Amino acid sequence: MKKTTRIVPAHKHIALVAHDNYKAELLRWVKENKEALQGHFLYATGTTGHLLSKETGLAIKSLLSGPMGGDQQLGALISEGKIDMMIFFWDPLNAVPHDPDVKALLRIATVWNVPVAMNRSSAKFMISSPRMTQEIEIEIPDYPAYLAERI
């Protein structure tokens, strides 16, 4: 597939997602990194977003709960170039009813070259990167070229 680029702004659009068994872990991480997160635009699936906003006071745009379509909403935002990175503390040991949605979300993040942190260690690396506060250029699929080839 042909590639093009897009500019990721210095003020990132960050998705915050956690399965039920990891909400407390994500909350702890957000509290520890509240100062670093304040300069960015935050999005979250419903239950997680309301919890994080209530407990930290951060402004978070809450979508629907994951099982009710929130994962798919995030995937759509990623496809539209409106999410720059995602912190997703998922539960690798327990299946959830919306596992196909989770897989689709991770697939679409990979397609559009969106960095995803799936645990505290990778989230720590991501949030502490000097690139967090810089404008950067990333490669993404050239969708118009893809469409032109298929029509």
Curated annotation (Swiss-Prot):
List residues binding substrate.
Answer: H19, K23, T45, G46, T47, T48, S65, G66, H98
Instruction: Report the residue ranges that make up the MGS-like domain in this protein.
Output: 6-151
Q: Name one Pfam family in it.
A: MGS
MF term (GO), any: methylglyoxal synthase activity
Question: Which keywords are on file for this protein?
Answer: Lyase
Top-level taxon in the UniProt lineage: Bacteria
Q: Which InterPro entries match?
A: Methylgl_synth, Methylglyoxal_synth_AS, MGS-like_dom, MGS-like_dom_sf
**Catalytic residues?**
D71
Report whether Phosphoprotein shows up as a keyword of the record: no
Its UniProt entry gives the catalysed reaction(s) as: dihydroxyacetone phosphate = methylglyoxal + phosphate
GO CC list: cytosol
Q: Name one GO biological process term.
A: methylglyoxal biosynthetic process
EC id: 4.2.3.3
Classification via SMART domains: MGS
The record ties this protein, via PANTHER family, to: METHYLGLYOXAL SYNTHASE
> What's the family?
Belongs to the methylglyoxal synthase family.
The entry's function note states: Catalyzes the formation of methylglyoxal from dihydroxyacetone phosphate.
Which protein, by its recorded name, is this? Methylglyoxal synthase
Species for this entry: Aliivibrio salmonicida (strain LFI1238) (Vibrio salmonicida (strain LFI1238))
